[in-house]
Curated annotation (Swiss-Prot):
<protein>
    <recommendedName>
        <fullName>Large ribosomal subunit protein bL27</fullName>
    </recommendedName>
</protein>
<feature type="region of interest" description="Disordered">
    <location>
        <begin position="1"/>
        <end position="20"/>
    </location>
</feature>
<dbReference type="GO" id="GO:0003735">
    <property type="term" value="F:structural constituent of ribosome"/>
</dbReference>
<dbReference type="GO" id="GO:0022625">
    <property type="term" value="C:cytosolic large ribosomal subunit"/>
</dbReference>
<dbReference type="Pfam" id="PF01016">
    <property type="entry name" value="Ribosomal_L27"/>
</dbReference>
<comment type="similarity">
    <text>Belongs to the bacterial ribosomal protein bL27 family.</text>
</comment>
<dbReference type="GO" id="GO:0006412">
    <property type="term" value="P:translation"/>
</dbReference>
<dbReference type="InterPro" id="IPR018261">
    <property type="entry name" value="Ribosomal_bL27_CS"/>
</dbReference>
<keyword id="KW-0687">Ribonucleoprotein</keyword>
<dbReference type="InterPro" id="IPR001684">
    <property type="entry name" value="Ribosomal_bL27"/>
</dbReference>
<keyword id="KW-0689">Ribosomal protein</keyword>
Amino acid sequence: MAHKKAGGSSRNGRDSAGQRLGVKKFGGELVIPGNIIVRQRGTKFYPGTNVGMGKDHTLFATAMGKVSFKHKAEGRTFVVVEPLPEAAE
């Protein structure tokens, strides 16, 4: 009789979905208040002028303007939203 021994089950086959972290608005892009600029774990980027930080370290715009990344001497990178000239009036 043709028999086949039962195959064992694989121990692989599971993976978690990515967390979609990273920079969402790059330098030079226009943002409006509430736009998410960076999603991160911990403080890889720090909030600068016109940028707020959520409890999960997400950086978001608090004013309309242009995004820029500033590198400080102590090695920290700050995300800044520079207001547009016409928006400052």
